[in-house]
């Protein structure tokens, strides 16, 4: 991991950071530096020790997924942000590169997701799972070139927030994400999945907020 996280937005109650590939959001017990550590150190450097102590991530991204991660900075307003997560009040869009040519232009993938009983690292589509909805729009179909196979550049809107949801849903459509080492085929480029934007009404100020993280790769 060479890139440093970048602050995209910050006020008294909320911070948004652009997470690079290779960094985890929360600690996993190994002592590895996390995005939460980075945000806490940044707040301490800004002289805001209370926020550095109180902060909580409002969303999480897999290690190799890049893009927007939100942090609540204030205990008093944390419940309001938590309720927004429950109410799905955050509109989240991802950019991704999927294997193969997707024939449809736009689709709502509505398939329940459960844990994979045969592999603890994975999730799967299954009737016993939790309701899960992903809206996918094809932005561009990329023809094979220079030895690369046909791929589809897509905009993905998360309507629910299950673990590995985008990866599982696209794999279930026979279009796994490029570079997905769990549900597809590993590639040198890594996982082509980027949390591009989040939009919401600020629970304190009432202001409409739209935050974007520039995509680190070209389709």
Question: Model regions: which residues?
Answer:
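A structural micro-motif recognizing beta-strand termini
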Residues: 99, 155-159
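RNA pseudouridine synthases
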Residues: 1-122, 127, 140-143, 147-148, ...
